Amino acid sequence: MKFIGHDSDIINYLVNDLTLLNSTLKQFKKHEVDGEPAISLMFELAYTEADVMLVFRNVFKNGFDGNPAAEPYNVDSCKFYHIGSKIYLSLDPDESEDGHDGISEDDNDFVLASHVEGYIFEEGMGE
């Protein structure tokens, strides 16, 4: 496991170097970090032998119903933004013209948090 960034760094990393598009959400976990609500999402990336885990800390809103990773969940589209002092990820975003940029009330499967940390698990990396 290797730390690959936090907040804007991880967003830029997953836009430029790797992508969540066409990945599979393979783990979803609600928990606490330092006494604050957190959500961890593990993605199996499509174009590399790597998995990426995102840990959202100090979660304000959780727009996931149940455990989305209970069944295969393919990421066909997503929003991943730094909005003001918050981090926003939607795995089922509103793609209409009105909802394309920013948070939309029609976005689904989302998390809004103060911070996000990213970790990469590469095959043969030795943990």
Regions found by a protein language model. Give the residues of each.
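Surface-exposed, interaction-prone regions used to assemble/regulate multi-protein complexes
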Residues: 1-127
